[in-house]
């Protein structure tokens, strides 16, 4: 085992990386409220794991979506638990994210030189809400269907381009299979990828600039 470690150490300098991580200075004013960002990350990882598990059984079609969710809840081993954890974690992620935004704002964590950290955080907040909007429609029940119809109909009030935006979101003039396919793709691929990229940027900036000081 020692030889294996030495082989990696010689090439990657693992010990130097570990020392940098473990020796980072933590200001004395930091309290439990400064952990809200990390809790949001934990919820996101839970979402990825449970969501990935459900993709094995979920069918993104208007005729089979609802029945596949029912199958997950009633037939798949621990499917009810996986989906429930996914829902609970989603709600907790939104709640903790909101608290995190308030904490950063109230403690002035958005001020110079951390403006870009704040911007990436706001983008992450928008992505988090987008997860909720797209995920809400995937069971394709009455609530999900009408929620999608209302949400995708909002841009229609925009002059000149409103109708085009609605058709772009829905994939057609009305809500249907194209809409579900779009929302499924957004929820399972586009949004997770964007969130992972912006989270990496967010944490690298925090790592570089450190935690903001007290008020």
From Swiss-Prot:
InterPro entries on file: Cyt_b/b6_N (IPR005797), Cyt_B6_PetB (IPR023530), Cytb/b6-like_sf (IPR027387), Cytochrome_b_N_euk/bac (IPR048259), Di-haem_cyt_TM (IPR016174)
GO biological process entries: photosynthesis; respiratory electron transport chain
Binding site for heme b 2: 86, 187
Transmembrane region(s): 32-52, 90-110, 116-136, 186-206
Keywords: Chloroplast, Electron transport, Heme, Iron, Membrane, Metal-binding, Photosynthesis, Plastid, Thylakoid, Transmembrane, Transmembrane helix, Transport
Binding site for heme c: 35
DNA damage as UniProt keyword: no
Swiss-Prot/TrEMBL cofactor(s): heme b; heme c
Residues that bind heme b 1: 100, 202
GO function term, MF aspect, one: electron transporter, transferring electrons within cytochrome b6/f complex of photosystem II activity
Keyword Metal-binding attributed: yes
Cofactor note: Binds 2 heme b groups non-covalently with two histidine residues as axial ligands. Binds one heme group covalently by a single cysteine link with no axial amino acid ligand. This heme was named heme ci.
Membrane topology of the entry: Multi-pass membrane protein
Biological function: Component of the cytochrome b6-f complex, which mediates electron transfer between photosystem II (PSII) and photosystem I (PSI), cyclic electron flow around PSI, and state transitions.
PANTHER family reported for this sequence: CYTOCHROME B
Subunit structure: The 4 large subunits of the cytochrome b6-f complex are cytochrome b6, subunit IV (17 kDa polypeptide, PetD), cytochrome f and the Rieske protein, while the 4 small subunits are PetG, PetL, PetM and PetN. The complex functions as a dimer.
HAMAP family recorded: Cytb6_f_cytb6
Miscellaneous information on this protein: Heme 1 (or BH or b566) is high-potential and absorbs at about 566 nm, and heme 2 (or BL or b562) is low-potential and absorbs at about 562 nm.
Protein family according to the UniProt entry: Belongs to the cytochrome b family. PetB subfamily.
Protein name: Cytochrome b6
Organism: Adiantum capillus-veneris (Maidenhair fern)
Gene: petB
């Amino acid at each position: 085992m020692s030889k294996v470690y030495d082989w990696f150490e010689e090439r990657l300098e693992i010990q130097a990386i570990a020392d940098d991580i473990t020796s980072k200075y933590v200001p004395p004013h930091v309290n439990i409220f400064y952990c809200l960002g990390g809790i949001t990350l934990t919820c996101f990882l839970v979402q990825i794991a449970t969501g990935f598990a459900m993709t094995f059984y979920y069918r993104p079609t208007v005729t089979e979506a609802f029945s596949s969710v029912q199958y997950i809840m009633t037939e798949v081993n621990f499917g009810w638990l996986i989906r429930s954890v996914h829902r609970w974690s989603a709600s907790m992620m939104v709640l903790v994210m909101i608290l995190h935004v308030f904490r950063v704002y109230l403690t002035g964590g958005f001020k110079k030189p951390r403006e870009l950290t704040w911007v990436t955080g706001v983008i992450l907040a928008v992505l988090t809400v987008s997860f909720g909007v797209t995920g809400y429609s995937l069971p394709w029940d009455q609530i999900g269907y009408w929620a999608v119809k209302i949400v995708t109909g909002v841009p229609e009030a925009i002059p000149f381009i409103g109708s085009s935006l609605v058709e772009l979101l829905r994939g057609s003039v009305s809500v249907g299979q194209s809409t579900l396919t779009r929302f499924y793709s957004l929820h399972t691929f586009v949004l997770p990828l964007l969130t992972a990229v912006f989270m990496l940027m967010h944490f690298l900036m925090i790592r570089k600039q450190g935690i903001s000081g007290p008020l």
